[in-house]
């Protein structure tokens, strides 16, 4: 007979509940949101499972009696190792990191473009003020002079 006990501090809150993934204490899989930079999927997010690192403050207690109960405990440990091997690690998913880097690069480029255009408008205003042609409403008043 095996007894599994998890510390209450090890559970992580899940923001969106789904019937596909059970409670985090039963399954050590968390979800990561990935935004795809395609025009057809704009605004949609994809959830992918990743493995959590084992925490030091979790407690595992296994007590087995002699005889058939010891075989049951071994079966539990084997099933846990199978679950861990089925989950793909983050290192083996280069596509996600590439998409994330590309999205960050695009955001930086957009921000830099906004700054450049704003600076260009300010320089243009400064030159027009120097010549006395700014603000444009002032030019209408000076037409008759």
Swiss-Prot record:
**Where found in the cell?**
Plastid, Chloroplast
PANTHER family, per database record: 50S RIBOSOMAL PROTEIN 5, CHLOROPLASTIC, LARGE RIBOSOMAL SUBUNIT PROTEIN CL37
Region Disordered, as annotated, extends over 125-145
**Coiled-coil region:** none
Question: What is the name of this protein?
Answer: Large ribosomal subunit protein cL37
This protein's transit peptide sits at: 1-63
Set out the biological process GO terms recorded for this chain's protein.
plastid translation
Gene symbol of the encoding locus: PSRP5
InterPro entries linked: Ribosomal_cL37 (IPR040307)
Q: How does it assemble?
A: Part of the 50S ribosomal subunit.
The terms describing its cellular component in GO are:
chloroplast thylakoid membrane; ribonucleoprotein complex; ribosome
Q: Does the keyword Mitochondrion apply?
A: no
Keyword annotations for this protein, in alphabetical order, are:
Chloroplast, Plastid, Ribonucleoprotein, Ribosomal protein, Transit peptide
Question: Would you identify the family this protein belongs to, as annotated?
Answer: Belongs to the chloroplast-specific ribosomal protein cL37 family.
């Amino acid at each position: 007979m095996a007894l599994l006990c998890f510390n209450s501090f090890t559970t992580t809150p899940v923001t969106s509940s789904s019937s596909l993934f059970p409670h985090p204490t039963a399954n050590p899989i968390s979800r990561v949101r990935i935004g795809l930079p395609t025009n057809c999927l704009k605004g949609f997010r994809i959830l992918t499972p990743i493995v959590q690192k084992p925490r030091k403050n979790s407690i595992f207690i296994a007590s087995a009696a002699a005889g058939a109960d010891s075989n049951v405990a071994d079966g539990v440990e084997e099933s846990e190792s199978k679950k861990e091997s089925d989950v793909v690690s983050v290192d083996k998913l280069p596509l996600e990191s590439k998409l994330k880097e590309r999205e960050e690069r695009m955001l930086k480029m957009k921000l830099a473009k906004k700054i450049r255009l704003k600076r260009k408008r300010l320089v243009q205003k400064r030159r027009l003020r120097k010549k006395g042609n700014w603000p444009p409403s002032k030019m209408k008043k000076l037409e008759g002079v």
